């Protein structure tokens, strides 16, 4: 054994060839600060070996290196800029020394090589991979950019266009694509990986492969003519500006850095990468996006822990076909759980099957599946007008009309047709689960399972625990949601549960602004362009359906009369009374016509102004700051109330439900991350300016206490140790 650290070791493999093996405790390898330091020590040992002829890097895990240890990021991001820059220089000196070894090097890459893992293998001369490879640089999705030389080496290896596509989008690619673009040199079966890598090394050692020529382009300026460079970087900057926008500085910074570094050799180019990385790491956007990643891990880990003692349902059923039922049936079948889809008429069943078939055909068109796979999946969806097969199902989700009487009747009837241990769930979006449970003989086997539309795209499923829902019931439904590829978050029961309960105060803020003379177009523009929502409130109401919102608004007002009962007729009432239900009937805040692709396209409609004039004061202008404050304060206050009342368990789960269920702008990180970034005292000052608008603007006492003591909702993070300590971590 030449060297042994906590996460890697170095040993002779055969005559003159050494192997450096990543083998961290636990299930995966991460390139954390300690591993970088250990790698530097191992390379120091190699530099002393006079009889070294070649080096092979590999992993003892199912994945090579899954990336940096993101749990370290928030503390690293608090390190002063100069210290963070010093540590990056140290880390890059390690990879430079790996790259500069006077012998050929190869990485035998299996599974994931992401982020720092990818940057590590870019420093070797050759890369051999297994078919399950996923390799790439996802850093821009975390609000930063590659910091271990990825933005320098990848463009020089692949060419600017291919590298920009991966780096700016935070992409990873599979084995075939990696081979095609030159990111790896070969793909072999897993059992032949090490032997194959040794064979390549022997060829390089014997002079059959020119490893020095392979290495040289990574040390030099990027080989691009002035015209090629102008075209590549101009196109890349335009595309990034269009897709990422101003709220995500990392992608455009990465492109500009690669452009600036193109004319320099390795050392100067790495200095430019360092100078770009450090300021990005100190942005609120990076903290928010890293926070989302960590919250996502926490939420998924919680679901895994919850379901460890239950069996995932093997057969499911959906009550009520149509778009929603068909979407749920498709998602279940697509992920391997056969499903019975029941409705009371053929027309709805046809609609549900058509929806499932349409989604599968899209997968076929994209080349994700072949005709055989399509036929196999669709054959596991069984449409029926009766309860045939219900005696075999493990879980049933009801997705009928949003009417408590209808839902109770359907659920009570279904309960008589299934096994005593079958779990029933309702896809209701607003009706309290405990109320629906009153119709059942076995309420302990019942809970809520709120999907979001469109089901195949929206990651969140709210799992609602009723007063009598058993732990096993919740666990089974969480297991099914996880199997469907969704992110389940368990909430306690109340009208609207969590997501809709906090959404409707936001709509109330919108209605009050319209009442006071604001223009709905400006509100939408501000909330989309300035705050960052994917849709403004008017457009969102048109998409959700104004009839749906009108009904849900009444349910929420009955559930929370003190805050959500309004004493005036609002824009939603006016449009509903005029039979303007949004995209579903082509008339809402806008008029809708289908474009060439069959998608609804909004157009101005003068009739809306007349309708809104009946429920609004004369038009007047509002500042962007006031629009954002009046829209967001009611929502954030309600989010805080949900935490204080135990409707949602943690700030992390609340923020993920908002991001995954409503599209809360990820660069803000969710309501609690936004609050912590803004500061609770500053938020309180802002909210107090609007207290006169009513109870929705009254800040909950718990938040007032946070403001008084300057306490955040997320646990405070300590800065990482000084850079000298990090080197020897």
Swiss-Prot record:
It catalyses: a (3S)-3-hydroxyacyl-CoA + NAD(+) = a 3-oxoacyl-CoA + NADH + H(+); a (3S)-3-hydroxyacyl-CoA = a (2E)-enoyl-CoA + H2O; a 4-saturated-(3S)-3-hydroxyacyl-CoA = a (3E)-enoyl-CoA + H2O; (3S)-3-hydroxybutanoyl-CoA = (3R)-3-hydroxybutanoyl-CoA. NAD(+) binds at residues 324, 343, 400-402, 407, 429, 453. GO terms for cellular component: fatty acid beta-oxidation multienzyme complex. Residues 1-189 are annotated as: Enoyl-CoA hydratase/isomerase. GO terms for molecular function: 3-hydroxybutyryl-CoA epimerase activity; delta(3)-delta(2)-enoyl-CoA isomerase activity; enoyl-CoA hydratase activity; long-chain-3-hydroxyacyl-CoA dehydrogenase activity; NAD+ binding. Residues 311-729 are annotated as: 3-hydroxyacyl-CoA dehydrogenase. The record marks 119, 139 as: Important for catalytic activity. The keyword Hydrolase does not apply. Disulfide bonds: none annotated. InterPro entries: 3-OHacyl-CoA_DH_CS, 3-OHacyl-CoA_DH_NAD-bd, 3HC_DH_C, 6-PGluconate_DH-like_C_sf, ClpP/crotonase-like_dom_sf, Enoyl-CoA_hyd/isom_CS, Enoyl-CoA_hydra/iso, FA_oxidation_alpha_subunit. CDD domains: crotonase-like. It holds the Pfam family ECH_1. One of its GO terms (biological process) is fatty acid beta-oxidation. The keyword Lyase applies. Residues 708-729 are annotated as: Disordered. Involved in the aerobic and anaerobic degradation of long-chain fatty acids via beta-oxidation cycle. Catalyzes the formation of 3-oxoacyl-CoA from enoyl-CoA via L-3-hydroxyacyl-CoA. It can also use D-3-hydroxyacyl-CoA and cis-3-enoyl-CoA as substrate. Heterotetramer of two alpha chains (FadB) and two beta chains (FadA). In the N-terminal section; belongs to the enoyl-CoA hydratase/isomerase family. In the C-terminal section; belongs to the 3-hydroxyacyl-CoA dehydrogenase family. This is Fatty acid oxidation complex subunit alpha. It comes from Shigella boydii serotype 18 (strain CDC 3083-94 / BS512). The lineage of its organism: Bacteria, Pseudomonadati, Pseudomonadota, Gammaproteobacteria, Enterobacterales.
């Amino acid at each position: 054994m030449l060297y042994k650290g906590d996460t890697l070791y170095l040993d002779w493999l055969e005559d003159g060839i050494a192997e450096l093996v990543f083998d961290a405790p636990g299930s995966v390898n991460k390139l954390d600060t300690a591993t970088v330091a250990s790698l530097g020590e191992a390379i120091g040992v190699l530099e002393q070996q006079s009889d070294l002829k070649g080096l092979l890097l590999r992993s003892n895990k199912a994945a090579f290196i899954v990336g940096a240890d993101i749990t370290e990021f928030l503390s690293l991001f608090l390190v002063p800029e100069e210290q963070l820059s010093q540590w990056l220089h140290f880390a890059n000196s390690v990879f430079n020394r790996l790259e500069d070894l006077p012998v050929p090097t190869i990485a035998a890459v299996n599974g994931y090589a992401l982020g720092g893992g990818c940057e590590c293998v870019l420093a070797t001369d050759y890369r051999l991979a297994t078919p399950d490879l996923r390799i790439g640089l996802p850093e821009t999705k975390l609000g930063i950019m590659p910091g271990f030389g990825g933005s320098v080496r990848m463009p020089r290896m692949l060419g600017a266009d291919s590298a920009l596509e991966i780096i700016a989008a935070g992409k990873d690619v599979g084995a075939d694509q990696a081979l095609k673009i030159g990111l790896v040199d070969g793909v072999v079966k897993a059992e032949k990986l090490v032997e194959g890598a040794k064979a390549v090394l022997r060829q390089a050692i014997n002079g059959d492969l020119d490893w020095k020529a392979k290495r040289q382009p990574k040390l030099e300026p990027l080989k691009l003519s002035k015209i090629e460079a102008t075209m590549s970087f101009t196109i890349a900057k335009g595309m990034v500006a269009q897709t990422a926008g101003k709220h995500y500085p990392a992608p455009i910074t990465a492109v500009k850095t690669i452009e600036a570094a193109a004319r320099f050799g390795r050392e100067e180019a790495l200095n430019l990468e360092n100078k770009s990385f450090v300021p990005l790491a100190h942005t609120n956007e990076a903290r928010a996006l890293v926070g989302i990643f960590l919250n996502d891990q926490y939420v998924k880990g919680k679901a895994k822990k919850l379901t460890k003692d239950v069996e995932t349902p093997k057969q499911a059923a959906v009550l009520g076909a149509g778009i929603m039922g068909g979407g749920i049936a498709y998602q279940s079948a697509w992920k391997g759980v056969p499903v019975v889809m029941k409705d009371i008429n053929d027309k709805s069943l046809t609609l549900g099957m058509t929806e499932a078939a349409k989604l599968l055909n899209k997968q076929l068109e994209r080349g994700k599946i072949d005709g055989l796979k399509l036929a196999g999946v669709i054959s596991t969806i069984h449409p029926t007008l009766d309860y045939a097969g219900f005696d075999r199902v493990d879980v049933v989700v009801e997705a009928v009309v949003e009417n408590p009487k209808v839902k109770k009747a359907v659920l009570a009837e279904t309960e008589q047709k299934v096994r005593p241990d079958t779990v029933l769930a309702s896809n209701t979006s607003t009706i309290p689960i405990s109320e629906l449970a009153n119709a059942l003989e076995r309420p302990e086997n019942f809970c809520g399972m709120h999907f979001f539309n469109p089901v195949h795209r929206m990651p969140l499923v709210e799992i609602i625990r009723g007063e009598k829902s058993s732990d096993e019931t919740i666990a089974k439904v969480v297991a099914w949601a996880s199997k469907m590829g969704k992110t389940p978050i368990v909430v306690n029961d109340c009208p609207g549960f969590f997501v809709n309960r906090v959404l409707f105060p936001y709509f109330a803020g919108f209605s009050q602004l319209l009442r006071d003379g604001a223009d709905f177009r400006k509100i939408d523009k501000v909330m989309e362009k300035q705050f960052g929502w994917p849709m403004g409130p008017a457009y969102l109401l048109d998409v959700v359906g104004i009839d749906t919102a009108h009904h849900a608004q009444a349910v929420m007002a009955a559930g929370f009369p003190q805050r959500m009962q309004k004493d005036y007729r609002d824009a939603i009432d006016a449009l509903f009374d005029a039979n303007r239900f949004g995209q579903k009937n082509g008339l809402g805040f806008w008029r809708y016509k289908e474009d060439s692709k069959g998608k609804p396209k909004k157009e101005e409609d003068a009739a809306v102004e007349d309708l809104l004039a009946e429920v609004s004061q004369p038009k007047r202008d509002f500042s962007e700051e006031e629009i954002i404050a009046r829209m967001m304060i009611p929502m954030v206050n309600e989010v805080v109330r949900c935490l204080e009342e135990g409707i949602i368990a943690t700030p992390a789960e609340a923020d993920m439900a908002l991001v995954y269920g409503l599209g809360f702008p990820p660069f803000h990180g969710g309501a609690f991350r936004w609050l912590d970034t803004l500061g609770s005292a500053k938020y309180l000052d802002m909210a107090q300016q609007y207290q006169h608008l009513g109870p929705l603007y009254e800040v909950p006492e718990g938040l007032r206490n946070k403001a008084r003591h300057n306490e955040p909702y997320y646990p405070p993070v300590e800065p990482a140790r000084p850079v000298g300590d990090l080197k020897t971590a």
